[in-house]
């Protein structure tokens, strides 16, 4: 499933990547 992490990654990487989120289509999604 692609659950939004409530974070965008247009200018900076996903800070929520430490929680297992990754950037996709300029939005951070949970893996």
UniProtKB/Swiss-Prot annotation:
Name of the protein described by the UniProt record: Cliotide T14
Tissue: Expressed in seed but not in root nodules.
Post-translational modification: Contains 3 disulfide bonds.
GO biological process, one term: defense response
Described purpose of this protein according to its UniProt entry: Probably participates in a plant defense mechanism. Not active against Gram-negative bacterium E.coli ATCC 700926 or Gram-positive bacterium S.aureus ATCC 12600 up to a concentration of 100 uM under low-salt conditions.
Family (UniProt): Belongs to the cyclotide family. Bracelet subfamily.
Alphabetically ordered keywords of this record: Disulfide bond, Knottin, Plant defense
Disulfide bond is among the record's keywords: yes
Cyclopeptide (Asp-Asn) crosslink site(s): 1-31
Top-level division of the source organism's lineage: Eukaryota
The keyword Manganese appears for this protein: no
Organism annotation: Clitoria ternatea
UniProt note: domains: The presence of a 'disulfide through disulfide knot' structurally defines this protein as a knottin.
Cysteine disulfide links: 5-21, 9-23, 14-28
């Amino acid at each position: 499933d692609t659950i939004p992490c409530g974070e965008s990654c247009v200018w900076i990487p996903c800070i929520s990547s430490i929680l297992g989120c990754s950037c996709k289509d300029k939005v951070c999604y949970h893996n």
